Amino acid sequence: MEKSFPQCGKNSTDFSTAWKTPLAAYFLVGPTASGKSAVAHCLAQESRPPAPLISADSMAIYRGMDVGTAKPEAADRAAGPYFGLDLVSPDQPFSVGDYLSAIHAATPEIVAAGGVPIVVGGTGLYVKALLEGLDPPASHPAHRAAAEAILAAEGLPALQAAARALNPAEFAKLRDPENPRRVIRAYELLAAGHPLPTPA
């Protein structure tokens, strides 16, 4: 399908500003190992000029995780251009907001590559964020301060317990609960009555 990136809110990546005009892009999405990467590569190479490829896969962002992630082969990547691959090491936290920021930072290169970009991947949250942008819940300084105070005085386990007590079902959704920054944000959202974002 062909879609255009919409105007995004002030808290999200604004592709229309980055490209000066709304960006048309093709989206090829599906589950891992369904063959979409190979199809996207062929389509990109048949385009004139060759179309840039933007990965929307939450596992392909990790350097060194090449087995089981269906990353394009080295020869295909050399024929590229590819974006959104090998952005961080596996031990680094990485959110959908970080993904949008990375793609935004790459926009000059994507534009310079020419052709209509092809977004390929199977992470629905990444695809949704590219199409609709992100509008994260508002900050709640009082709740954040309370979380930071618990962390400073009693440590991460106490903060985890406090956040879990606010909403056990929602807290169970938290990705990387050993990351203090994420637990602080979870406490802030749950104390304000917000659900946690769906994990990528």
Residue ranges and their predicted role:
Residues 2-8, 12-200:
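Phosphate/pyrophosphate-binding catalytic cores of soluble transferases and nucleic-acid-acting enzymes
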